[in-house]
């Protein structure tokens, strides 16, 4: 009902007892159902009041240069990051974005992170960062904002981002990163970031939960 929009954001969710009575299930099943809805970010519990449908949708403006952390703060959400892996590479990294092939000169650092909002995983990101421009970045706290690290530790500010957004389905091994059991729609974002004319600082290949994200763009004539 929540996914279909029958219960809009802010609507009260049936209590455990109401679920038991309506669907003729056990206490354990009803409790587990509510727990799963909360874990997946669909509902939120308010002490003394009950459980309500959560407005989990985040809007990301793709014509602005700003990161996940700022996006979540502006949306009134609490951001968090978990570093799940990194590797160092000496070779170049190539990526095709919007029909153009770009090359990130080696050596570079490859990192994998899960990004959370209010404790719910919204994005799995892969980043490929130039070690020539950001030496020893793998020794930094990579659970912080990368844009903040670029600016504070290296004096680097992004000047341009070229991105491509495509529709995919979260399934298989990807589901565990989002604490999900069933396939859901998602967005794949591939991008290349510049910090000067033709100077590539990083590349991205990330997956966003499609049921919790909207992408917005503004064009002026």
Q: How does the language model describe each region?
A:
Residues 15, 52-65:
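Short, cationic-aromatic polyanion-contact patches
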Residues 1-53:
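N-terminal helix-turn-helix
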Residues 39, 45, 61, 66-74, ...:
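Extended, compositionally biased flexible segments
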Residues 48, 56, 218:
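Surface loops and adjacent helix of pleckstrin homology
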Residues 1, 71, 149, 153:
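Solvent-exposed, charged/polar functional surfaces in cytosolic regulatory/catalytic domains
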Residues 66, 79-221:
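C-terminal all-alpha effector/ligand-binding and dimerization domain
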């Amino acid at each position: 009902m929540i996914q279909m929009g029958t219960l809009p954001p802010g609507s009260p969710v049936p209590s455990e007892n109401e679920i038991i009575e309506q669907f003729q299930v056990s206490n354990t099943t009803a409790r587990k159902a509510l727990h799963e809805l909360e874990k997946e970010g669909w509902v939120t519990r308010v002490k003394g009041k009950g459980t309500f449908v959560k407005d989990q949708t985040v809007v990301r403006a793709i014509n602005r240069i700003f990161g996940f952390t700022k996006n979540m703060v502006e949306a009134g959400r609490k951001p968090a990051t978990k570093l799940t892996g990194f590797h160092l590479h000496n070779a170049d990294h190539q990526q095709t974005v919007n029909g153009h092939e770009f090359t990130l000169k080696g050596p570079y650092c490859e990192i994998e992170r899960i990004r959370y909002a209010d404790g719910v995983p919204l994005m799995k990101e892969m980043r490929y960062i130039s070690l020539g421009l950001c030496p020893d970045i793998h020794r930094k706290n990579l659970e912080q904002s990368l844009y903040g690290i670029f600016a504070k530790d290296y004096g680097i500010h992004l000047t341009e981002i070229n991105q491509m957004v495509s529709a995919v389905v979260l399934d298989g091994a990807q589901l565990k990163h989002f604490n999900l059991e069933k396939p859901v729609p998602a967005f794949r974002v591939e991008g290349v970031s510049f910090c000067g004319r033709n100077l590539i600082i990083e590349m991205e290949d990330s997956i966003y939960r499609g049921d919790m994200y909207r992408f917005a763009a503004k064009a002026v004539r």
